[in-house]
UniProtKB/Swiss-Prot annotation:
Residues 98-125 are annotated as: Disordered. Cell division inhibitor that blocks the formation of polar Z ring septums. Rapidly oscillates between the poles of the cell to destabilize FtsZ filaments that have formed before they mature into polar Z rings. Prevents FtsZ polymerization. Belongs to the MinC family. The gene is minC. NCBIfam families: minC (TIGR01222). InterPro entries: CAP/MinC_C, MinC, MinC_C_sf, MinC_N, Septum_form_inhib_MinC_C. Residues 100-110 have a biased composition (Basic and acidic residues). Coiled coil: none annotated. Disulfide bonds: none annotated. It comes from Enterobacter sp. (strain 638). The keyword Cell division applies. It comes from the Bacteria. This is Probable septum site-determining protein MinC.
Amino acid sequence: MSNTPIELKGSSFTLSVVHLHDAKPEVIRQALEDKIAEAPAFLKHAPVVVNVSGLDAPVNWQHLQQAVSSTGLRIVGISGCKDAKLKNEIERAGLPLLNEGKEKTARSAPKEAPTPPPQTQTVTSVTKTRMIDVPVRSGQRIYAPNCDLIVTSHVSAGAELIADGNIHVYGMMRGRALAGASGDRDAQIFCTHLTAELVSIAGEYWLSDKIPAEFYGKAARLLLAENALTVQPLN
């Protein structure tokens, strides 16, 4: 048992981000209800981050917050806020403003560095992989942070696979697969039998009825092409 009453540790969680592109609360509420109806098991009462970077018109934050919350979604933070007035309103509402990381800025050319001595040892880069060798049953959620996830058995309906990297399923895939959970748009999903309830890469998702019929139940590879999900045969 620890001698300290609390312990702070870094961790990562998979959250959906709601990008607002309209300042009208009723429009937002209806659009969210329509999305939730498409994937209730995935989105109902889900914790979400609200991104406001797409809002140009004056915003009544209290009404917008009520519109999002009225759908059952639980706002855990706000991102993309650069307007000082809106920041004050959000802070008064008791919601945290989240940083999305530093933007890359142009840098002047670095000074020429001295030539390093010859390498005497070859360093091989190793990517971690989480391996699951047993069936993943309904209600189970498996997360592979900062690595790929490989499942060598079946994944039942109602089960959820999440990975920051790629997902490989060498069995019947009936549940939900979310690759690139931390935003890696190069992540992919590989299935030998694709019958998933939901597939997602870096937040771009399909429900089962969006999977092209010619790939349903077949060996398939999913990836992002031109910012949209696409599927290819897995040979």
